[in-house]
């Protein structure tokens, strides 16, 4: 029996708690057609990816994952291809962290590691992946945020017992990533379009969400903003992959325009729109943790999800 896989990184907008609702809206053919190519253009922390890898009822012919964050994708590759080298670097960093007995010492070490990470001084991909994971697990509230120059700028988080080197998880994730035919891409989401296999592609699209208000979200995961113009480009991408015969599901916020109408129901007119309800646990203001409605858009009907949506609204 293979070990249990879980996301190796904390990532805002992670889908772990939403998966039961999302799976209720899956197209039925992913359970019956082993020739399907599964694509995630915005893989992020990989909650959906790892869940599907472990689902014994789903068998994909091929998997394509992509993210614009090069360091995140370097982590995926390091975990898949060289987990023991990565663990060696993580153990070294973990030893240094716990050697510091005061919070001031741990804080100084954090900023020294952050400076090394931002300077590009790492001597290997595994060292850079290890620093990425260390910063993610010891920074404030598990955020990933960069400034306009692309430098990671989240402060030290003062966590009591951060798990810096989760050897069991990294080895489990590596085993699962090596159990399938998987291609890992870095860059703009649109490049996955060339991997669409007509009639045999399911794509889960989880882009940066449109903020519910001008002050409702922290700044970017990369130094490339994902504004309304980008949301419109993404809709055009969905039109293209639909025309190529791909099946897709897209998540986003239930953002409203100035008149109070749903931004995404208007933008994706002609597609199927549902609601799901998300507990949000990573936020710059950690005390704000509540269930928020989100939009789920598909290019196929799903009565089970529509019934679920209606019951939530009543």
Where are these regions (language model features)?
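S-adenosyl-L-methionine
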Residues: 1-37, 42, 47-48, 55, ...
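Short amphipathic alpha-helix with an adjacent loop that forms part of the alpha/beta core around
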Residues: 27-30, 193-199
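Conserved proline-anchored active-site loop of SAM-dependent methyltransferases
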Residues: 38-52, 65-69, 133-140, 147, ...
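Class I S-adenosyl-L-methionine-dependent methyltransferase module
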Residues: 55-179, 183
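Mobile active-site "lid"/loop adjacent to the S-adenosyl-L-methionine
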Residues: 146-160, 209-230
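Short loop/edge segments at beta-strand edges and connector loops
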Residues: 185-188, 277
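Conserved Class I SAM-dependent methyltransferase catalytic core
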Residues: 231-279
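Class I S-adenosyl-L-methionine
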Residues: 267-309
């Amino acid at each position: 029996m293979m070990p249990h896989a879980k996301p190796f990184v904390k990532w805002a907008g992670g889908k772990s708690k939403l998966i039961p609702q999302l799976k209720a809206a899956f197209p039925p053919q992913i359970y019956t057609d082993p020739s399907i190519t599964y694509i995630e253009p915005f893989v992020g922390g990989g909650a959906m990816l790892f869940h599907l890898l472990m689902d014994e009822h789903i068998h994909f012919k091929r998997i394509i994952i992509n993210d614009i964050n090069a360091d995140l994708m370097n982590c995926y590759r390091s975990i898949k291809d060289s987990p023991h080298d990565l663990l060696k670097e993580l153990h070294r960093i973990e030893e240094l962290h716990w050697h510091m007995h005061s919070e001031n010492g741990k804080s100084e070490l954090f900023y020294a590691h952050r400076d090394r990470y931002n300077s590009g001084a790492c001597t290997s991909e595994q060292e850079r992946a290890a620093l990425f994971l260390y910063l993610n697990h010891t920074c404030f509230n598990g955020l990933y945020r960069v400034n306009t120059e692309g430098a990671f700028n989240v402060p030290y988080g003062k966590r009591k017992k951060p798990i810096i080197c989760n050897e069991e998880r990294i080895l489990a994730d590596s085993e699962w990533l090596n159990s399938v035919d998987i291609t890992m891409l870095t860059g703009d989401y649109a490049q996955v379009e060339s991997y669409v296999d007509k009639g045999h592609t399911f794509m889960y699209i989880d882009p940066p969400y449109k903020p519910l208000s001008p002050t409702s979200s922290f700044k970017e995961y990369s130094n490339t903003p994902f504004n309304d113009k980008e949301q419109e480009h993404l809709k055009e991408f969905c039109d293209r992959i639909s025309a190529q015969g791909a099946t897709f599901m897209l998540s986003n916020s239930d953002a409203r325009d100035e008149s109070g109408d749903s931004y995404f129901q208007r933008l994706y007119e002609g597609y199927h729109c549902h609601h799901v309800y998300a507990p949000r646990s990573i936020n710059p203001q950690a005390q704000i943790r509540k269930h928020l409605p989100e939009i789920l858009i598909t290019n196929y009907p799903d009565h089970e999800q529509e019934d679920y949506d209606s019951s939530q609204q009543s």
